[in-house]
Amino acid sequence: GFCPIEDVYAFPDGWYESWDLTDKDMTPVIGIQSNLWTELVHNDDRFDFMIYPRLCALAESGWTEAKNKNYADFSCRLNSAYELFDELGIYYFDYRDPSAHKEPEGPVIKKKGAPKPKMDYRD
């Protein structure tokens, strides 16, 4: 589902607090990763739109301690990233003006029911 950039930037702050993890439990955790399920990503524009600028927010979230995070400051820095996206021809979601880049339409998915069995009635 849709994940606002503010939520991505806030990750992983507090997401695991309710799990009652010990320091030992957290030892194998060395970083964060981002996934994109691509079964409905049919071209490069849709791919870019789905990950940018959220990937920037997640990257900064990974190297910034929770106490140093400031979404307003991040938003200002993100403006430079938008300039770079434009230079590189990346089709991104612009949270400042969502109508600037409309979401590329995905493929039409037609759901088919199970094939009807052929019935042969004999006396």
Model feature map: region roles:
Residues G1-D123:
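Substrate-binding groove of N-acetylhexosamine-processing glycoside hydrolases
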